[in-house]
């Protein structure tokens, strides 16, 4: 009988996780796994059926934590699933695990209790934890009152002088959009005002108008950004999955007030700077002390940790320093997608995380492959002249996909912000990140990963320019509402140019 893994959530990573669990072929750990989507988006069941993906779906009454908990408890009790991986952090932050703990089912969930979800849900508390256990973070960080502009100004000016930049962070859950980078003195007030405008309501809901509003300010870190996903079981065994690199800025170039951090515009795996020495550094400097902290604070349980880091390296590509930017407690979107498309035994790894024997299950990685994920997002325009993702988006427009063409070109399409009209039999956009396009390429040893990445980018660009993936604007039936970053994957080329004799 198949071991059934539920993935609870609504976005693209949720569906792809179920697809990979059901279809990936392991060489060592068996293949009898079934992926199950808990909730998903309305477009996903008909989309999966049209693609003949062997994925099952479990509905929920609504998108609340209570509805998820009810559906998951029923599914675990009736055998529809054997375990569950919550995908969005809000489910854990709102206490999903606590609900399952009340009925004796918490050992079937990967994640933390509401109390211990502070690792992601409270960045200031997480910084204190890292400091206590010598997990490297930014050289300087301060917890200040968001209502005290004079202190914020003074702190930012010092950090600009010493580190060339400062980062303001709303310290609570913000969907990956709570960081604001300041690169010069002129930006301080405008960036501060924008952050307060975006999160003032959230602050008031948490603390009221008269209390202090916690704000995290960090020194800007240099180096390259790199992400890791670590599975940890109840005994403290762990496995580090392949690396990824996120493209969080809306447009190419550094983040700024005009180029905001989004939920993610795309991702690649592996990171161009991935090396065996790097995995050793991560295990020693981050994972081992973090597990020690979890054990000593009675937090150790089946979980998934996702630290975003800054990496420094020498001219031989050897890692010299790594610092944690933040730690998340769920699979990232979209970084999770290219990672799991390179793993043959996702189901076995998740099962081992639940059962406590991760030391016996090694990730089977397609080490000869690179994978690229590109988010197709809602662009500008619409009835109210919307600015497009990540600002304001029009919805309800027809999605037009040439499935035969995309299958021929081996472009995998994952629906995300997409609905389905059963009466009309059509898919419609629902704003934000509508579709993810995933492509993989095998790279022969000694050959250029940059050239392979360029071929993959051209696949997606050609499909887009030829109208093979469209959201049809109401005002222009021949147009395309979708937009995307055309530079996803170019860091393979940049790495080869930087270290031509090594990469």
Predicted regions: what is each one?
Residues 196-199, 211, 221-272, 283-324, ...:
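Phosphate-binding core of ATP-grasp and ATP-grasp-like enzymes
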Residues 136-138, 161-168, 182-227, 288-297:
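Conserved ATP-binding module of the ATP-grasp superfamily
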Residues 204-216, 293-308, 358-371, 463-491:
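Flexible, glycine/charged-enriched surface loops at secondary-structure junctions
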Residues 280-307, 328-408, 412, 421:
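Active-site "cap" helix and flanking loop/linker of ATP-utilizing ligase/carboxylase catalytic domains
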Residues 219, 267-270, 374-375, 433-445:
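Short, well-ordered beta-strand elements within core beta-sheets of diverse protein domains
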Residues 54, 103-179, 202, 377:
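A conserved helix-loop-beta module that forms one wall/lid of the active-site cleft
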Residues 428-503:
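Generic C-terminus detector
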């Amino acid at each position: 009988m198949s071991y059934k893994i539920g993935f609870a959530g609504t976005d693209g990573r949720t569906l792809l996780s179920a697809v990979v669990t059901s279809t990936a072929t392991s060489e060592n750990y068996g293949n009898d796994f079934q992926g199950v989507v808990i909730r998903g988006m309305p477009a996903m069941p008909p989309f999966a059926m049209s693609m003949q993906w062997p994925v099952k779906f479990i509905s929920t009454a609504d998108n609340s934590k209570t509805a998820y908990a009810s559906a998951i408890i029923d599914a675990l009790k009736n055998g529809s699933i054997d375990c569950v991986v919550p995908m969005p952090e809000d489910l854990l932050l709102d206490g999903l695990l606590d609900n399952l703990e009340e009925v004796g089912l918490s050992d079937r969930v990967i994640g933390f209790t509401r109390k211990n979800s502070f690792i992601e849900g409270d960045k200031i508390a997480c910084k204190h934890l890292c400091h206590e256990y010598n997990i490297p973070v930014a050289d300087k960080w301060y917890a200040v009152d968001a209502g005290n502009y004079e202190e914020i100004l003074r702190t930012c000016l010092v950090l600009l002088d010493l580190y060339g930049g400062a980062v303001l962070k709303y310290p609570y859950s913000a969907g990956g959009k709570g960081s604001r980078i300041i690169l010069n003195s002129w930006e301080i007030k405008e960036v501060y005002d924008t952050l307060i405008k975006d999160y003032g309501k959230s602050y008031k809901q948490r603390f009221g108008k008269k209390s202090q509003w916690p704000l995290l300010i960090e020194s800007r870190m240099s180096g390259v950004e790199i992400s890791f996903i670590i599975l940890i079981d109840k005994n403290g065994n762990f496995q580090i999955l392949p690396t990824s690199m996120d493209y969080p800025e809306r447009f190419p170039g550094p983040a700024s007030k005009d180029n905001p951090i989004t939920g993610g515009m795309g991702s690649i795996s592996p990171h161009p700077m991935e090396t065996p020495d790097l995995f050793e550094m991560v295990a020693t400097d981050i994972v081992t002390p973090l597990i020690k902290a979890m054990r000593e604070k009675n937090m150790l349980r089946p979980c998934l940790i996702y630290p975003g880091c800054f990496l420094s390296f020498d001219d031989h590509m050897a890692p010299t320093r790594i610092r944690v930017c933040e730690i998340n407690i769920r699979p990232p979107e979209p970084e999770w997608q290219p990672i799991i498309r390179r793993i043959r035994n996702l189901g076995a790894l998740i099962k081992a995380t639940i059962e406590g024997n991760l030391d016996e299950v090694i990730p089977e990685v397609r080490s000869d492959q690179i994978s690229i994920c590109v988010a197709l997002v809602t662009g500008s325009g619409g009835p109210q002249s919307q600015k497009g993702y990540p600002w304001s988006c029009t919805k309800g427009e027809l999605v037009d996909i040439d499935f035969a063409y995309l299958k021929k070109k081996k472009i995998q399409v994952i629906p995300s912000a997409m609905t389905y009209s059963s009466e009309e039999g059509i898919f419609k956009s629902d704003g934000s990140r509508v579709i993810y396009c995933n492509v993989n390429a095998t790279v022969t040893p000694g050959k250029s990963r940059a050239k392979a990445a360029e071929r993959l980018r051209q696949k997606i660009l050609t499909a887009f320019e030829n109208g093979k993936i469209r959201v049809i604007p109401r005002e222009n039936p021949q147009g395309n509402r979708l937009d995307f970053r055309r530079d996803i994957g170019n860091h393979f080329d940049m790495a080869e140019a930087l270290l031509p004799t090594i990469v």
